[in-house]
Amino acid sequence: MNGTCIDRTPPCINRAASVWETLQHFHPSRIGHGVRSAEDERLLDFLKKENIHLEVCPTSNVQTNVVNTIQDHPADKIFRHGVSMSINCDAKTISPVTLSSEYALLEKTFNWNKEHFLHCNLQAINHAFCEPSLKEKIRQQLITAYTAAG
């Protein structure tokens, strides 16, 4: 791949084809953004089967016109399909939001609750680029914190 997209638009705007192209050429274990994957059921099936993680940034996707409104965002569809995903807030220079505000937005829009967020965070840990012992330590801390929060 030469760094350009089929129609010269950023990968997350170039529909599901750009995700397929990335998978074919780079064989990643995780993909930044990748929300256009939701436009292709076969792609969602592949991501789930291959356990490829999507880093999802809802507010950024609205701000960059990947989706028109937060109600149009495919985060809930991706989650319900069983694809590994995490919720992120993108770079502060792009989207000056916090992870807490992203969670509040998904809670309000899709009726997500702490079980959704715990699941996404555990998936993020599973796909983190660090030693298994550190993943386990963070996983236990996260579960303890969610349990204590009721």
Tell me what each language-model feature is:
Residues 1-13, 83-98:
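Short acidic/histidine-rich active-site segments
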Residues 12-25, 41-47, 64-76, 92-106:
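Histidine/acidic-residue-rich catalytic or RNA/ligand-binding cores of hydrolases
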Residues 23-30, 48-55, 81-84:
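Glycine-enriched alpha-helix->loop->beta-strand junction motifs that scaffold or abut catalytic
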Residues 29-38, 63:
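Catalytic beta/alpha-barrel core
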Residues 31, 54, 90, 131:
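Conserved, mostly hydrophobic/aromatic
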Residues 76-79, 87:
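A post-motif C-terminal structural segment
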Residues 111-150:
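Mid-to-C-terminal alpha-helical segments outside catalytic/metal-binding sites
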